Swiss-Prot record:
Residues 111-150 are annotated as: Disordered. DNA helicase activity requires Mg(2+). This is Large T antigen. Residues 417-579 form the SF3 helicase domain. The J domain is essential for multiple viral activities, including virion assembly, viral DNA replication, transformation and transcriptional activation. GO terms for biological process: DNA replication; symbiont-mediated perturbation of host cell cycle G1/S transition checkpoint; symbiont-mediated suppression of host innate immune response; symbiont-mediated suppression of host JAK-STAT cascade via inhibition of JAK1 activity; symbiont-mediated suppression of host type I interferon-mediated signaling pathway. It comes from WU polyomavirus. Gene3D superfamilies: 3.40.1310.20, DnaJ domain, Large T antigen, SV40, domain 3, P-loop containing nucleotide triphosphate hydrolases, Zinc finger, large T-antigen D1 domain. Residues 12-89 form the J domain. A motif (Nuclear localization signal) lies at residues 140-147.
Length: 648
């Protein structure tokens, strides 16, 4: 301890710790007091910042000096350990005492001469005295540390590629390497063999240090092995690492600068001794993120929680699944068989939401790539294919066919040329010509404009937007349209026209400020929370509104205005056929597509879906003829139940 701090520094440190100088050298007590004083002097706790800085500097200096002195003592061959002190009074003790004091006498030797008494005359200095250089007061240069000293400061760099670099990990392993002093390595080699019943253990020297390598029959955390070794290395340095490549590490430690000292199996380890199950236990299946992404892509799911719920349903056994047993959905049966094993692993995963979010990102990325590489006509044809597949699952028998054809009859009662209107709208959104991209559905309340707009939105795919919100919130509302095929600005409010009972709103004013969005001539910036801005042509679509005034600057952006008028018989027939509203038949894209199949020739459809269109035309002819459909139209006109059959 006398070689650590100066006398004044030691006194100052003990005063700051609140200890008497008699406690100097009691490191555990000083450590306890140091932690206590840190809380007392800390500035955040109302302490003295200057005292805190001084205490830290002195205590850290003490720790460094103690470590340095310990290392120097280990390097000195002539230092006696306490167990080697001979018995007092024997010749061996006398020799030991003389050797012990010779070191201190050399250290305490002083070359200065005592001043002479005043009566003595000074002697004449010789030439040799004059030429003797004066003693320098500068600090002597520190001895350059060799590799043996440096080896104890860090883990060998030669082995870093074979070990785990994780600092805080709960991972369990069967291979470990311990780096410490040579003396402690001998002790730990025996203790570790006994404690962990090691399958293999070896000890290797590395300059003035040593390493112990062990293979255990059971898996352990690195912290468990490290804590066990700490019990034998209270002062000596210690590095404990988990090993990722056991044979690679052992092979490297048999070559320079390492030296094999001993091992419990003669001949050591061979490369063919190792298999994955030998080192890491039985192989465990891991969750396949790619399979989950493929599942989301096939179903077109872009909702995290919907994907999470659907995939969890696949974790049950196929034999116990009600959907599979009912054979209602062939696609579900196939997906359940393909993904049941992976879904079971997914149910045990602790990062379910993160995995689902990545799968959703894959779906969005695929959709964005398709929007760049495919024409709008091909995108719409693919959308129709999905709706036709959905029709195969939903419309299964005569009752379902009649229900959806009742919806077709209602639409033809709304507008006798509704099929021509829909066909022209589809042509407009596919061509997407600037300033000819938006239609306006205008009419009083309960005139059917929102029903038609919702069905067209479901047919083509897209999102409905609320434009009546304050202008400062529009950016995130418009961001919903990113990568969408169409949009609907629903129930836009504006300045009151002839109907004074309507409430006014700022929807028209907001649309007037979005002329670039409606024109489609230039790309606009769309943004969502937690996502970067996306530049794209804003999607075409529909604007629904009551009898509001359209600003003169906004009217040229609308390609066509479709006027709707309330019809009493439509409302009455709908009230008497509640199934259409309960099952949302009129708002479904399937109903509009069935209407096109019923009314339009096959040649009007894209070639890739014409075969399915022919199939559905034949199916409709099988379940409903022209006479029965005419009866449905008559029921709509009379305000009766559309599904009511007439007596012959």
């Amino acid at each position: 301890m006398d070689k650590t701090l100066s006398r004044n520094e030691a006194k100052e440190l003990m005063q700051l710790l609140g200890l008497d100088m008699t406690c100097w050298g009691n490191l555990p007590l000083m450590r306890t007091k140091y932690l206590s004083k840190c809380k007392e002097f800390h500035p955040d706790k109302g302490g003295n910042e200057e005292k805190m800085k001084k205490l830290n500097s002195l205590y850290l200096k003490l720790q460094e000096c103690v470590s340095t002195v310990h290392q120097l003592n280990e390097e000195e061959d002539e230092v006696w350990s306490s167990s080697q002190i001979p018995t007092y009074g024997t010749p061996d003790w006398d020799y030991w005492w003389s050797q012990f004091n010779s070191y201190w006498e050399e250290e305490l030797r002083c070359n200065e001469e005592m001043p002479k008494s005043p009566g003595e005359t000074p002697t004449k200095r010789t030439r040799e005295d004059d030429e003797e250089p004066q003693c320098s007061q500068a600090t002597p240069p520190k001895k350059k540390k060799d590799n043996a000293t440096d080896a104890s400061l860090s883990f060998p760099k030669e082995l870093e590629e074979f070990v785990s670099q994780a600092v805080f990990s709960n991972r369990t392993l069967t291979a470990f390497v311990i780096h410490t002093t040579k003396e402690k390595a001998e002790t730990l080699y025996k203790k570790l063999l006994s404690k962990f019943k090691c399958n293999f253990a070896s000890r290797h020297s590395y300059y003035n240090t040593a390493l112990v390598f062990i293979l255990t029959p059971f898996r352990h955390r690195v912290s468990a092995v490290n804590n066990f070794c700490k019990g034998y290395c209270t002062i000596s340095f210690l590095f404990c690492k988990g090993v990722n490549n056991a044979y690679g590490l052992y092979s490297r430690m048999t070559r320079d600068p390492f030296t094999l000292c001993e091992e419990n199996i003669p001949g050591g380890l061979k490369e063919n001794d190792f298999k994955a199950e030998d080192l890491y236990g039985e192989f465990k299946d891991q969750l396949n993120w790619k399979a989950l992404s493929e599942f989301a892509l096939e179903l077109g799911i872009d909702d995290v929680y919907l994907l999470l719920g659907l995939y969890l349903q696949l974790s049950i056994k196929v034999e116990e699944c009600e959907k599979c047993n009912s054979n209602e959905d062939a696609t579900h049966n196939r997906l359940h068989m393909e993904h049941q094993k992976n879904a079971l692993l997914f149910s045990d995963s602790k990062s379910q939401k993160n995995v689902c979010q990545q799968a959703i990102d894959v779906v969005i990325a695929k959709r964005r790539v398709d929007s760049l590489n495919m024409s709008r006509e091909d995108l719409l044809a693919r959308r129709f294919e999905k709706i036709l597949d959905k029709m195969d699952k939903t419309i299964k028998g005569e009752q379902d066919v009649l229900l959806y054809m009742a919806g077709v009859a209602w639409y033809l009662g709304l507008n006798g040329k509704i099929d021509e209107l829909v066909y022209r709208y589809l042509k407009v959104i596919v061509e997407n010509v600037p300033k000819k991209r938006y239609w306006v559905f205008k009419g009083p309340i309960n005139s059917g404009k929102t029903t038609v707009a919702a069905a067209l939105l479901d047919l083509c795919g897209g999102k409905a937007l609320n434009i009546n919100i304050p202008a400062d919130r529009l950016n995130f509302e418009l961001g919903v349209a990113i990568d969408q095929f169409t949009v609907v600005f629903e129930d836009v409010k504006g300045q009151v026209g002839d109907n004074k009972l309507l409430p006014s709103g700022n929807g028209m004013s907001n649309l007037d400020n979005l002329r670039d969005y409606l024109d489609g001539s230039v790309k606009v910036n769309l943004e969502k929370k937690h996502l970067n801005k996306r530049s794209q042509i804003f999607p075409p679509g529909i604007v629904t509104m009551n009898e509001y005034l359209v600003p003169a600057t906004l009217a040229p952006r609308f390609h066509k205005t479709v006027l709707f008028t309330p019809k009493r018989h439509l409302k009455e027939s709908l009230d008497k056929t509640p199934e259409l509203m309960v099952k949302r038949v009129l708002q479904s894209g399937m109903c509009i597509l069935l209407m096109l199949i019923w009314c339009r020739p096959v040649s009007d459809f894209h070639p890739c879906i014409q075969a399915k269109v022919v199939y559905w035309k034949e199916l409709l002819d099988k379940y409903i003829g022209l006479t029965e459909f005419a009866d449905m139209q008559m029921n709509v006109t009379n305000g009766c139940n559309i599904l009511e059959k007439h007596n012959a």
